[in-house]
């Protein structure tokens, strides 16, 4: 356990940021799963709406530093390919 005041504060800050990151990652995974479920079911309209929400969530997670911007871009590209296969 830290004795220095600033170190104690850092521990508190790290806990809150870790919690925030877990919440964002969890909601991101849920959004991606909803999109994939819509693609699997073949529902084009639901997939398009879900894709928009997923892209927004990926961009938000990347801007907050929860995931790397390249990972977000890679995921968006992969999901866009799935959507294009469904609509084609």
Swiss-Prot record:
GO cellular component, one term: cytosol
Molecular function via GO: small ribosomal subunit rRNA binding; structural constituent of ribosome
An example Gene Ontology biological process: translation
Keyword Ribonucleoprotein (UniProt): yes
Coiled coil: none
Signal peptide: none
Domain of life: Bacteria
Keywords: Ribonucleoprotein, Ribosomal protein, RNA-binding, rRNA-binding
UniProt entry tagged with the keyword Nucleotide-binding: no
Protein role: Binds directly to 16S ribosomal RNA.
Membership in a protein family: Belongs to the bacterial ribosomal protein bS20 family.
UniProt-recorded name of the protein: Small ribosomal subunit protein bS20
Gene: rpsT
């Amino acid at each position: 356990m830290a004795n220095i005041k600033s170190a104690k504060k850092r521990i508190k800050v790290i806990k809150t940021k870790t919690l925030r990151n877990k919440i964002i990652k969890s909601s991101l995974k849920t959004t991606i799963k909803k999109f994939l479920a819509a693609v699997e079911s073949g529902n084009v309209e639901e997939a398009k709406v879900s894709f928009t929400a997923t892209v927004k969530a990926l961009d938000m997670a990347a801007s907050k530093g929860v995931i790397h911007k390249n990972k977000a871009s890679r995921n968006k590209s992969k999901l866009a390919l799935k959507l294009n296969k469904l609509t084609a």
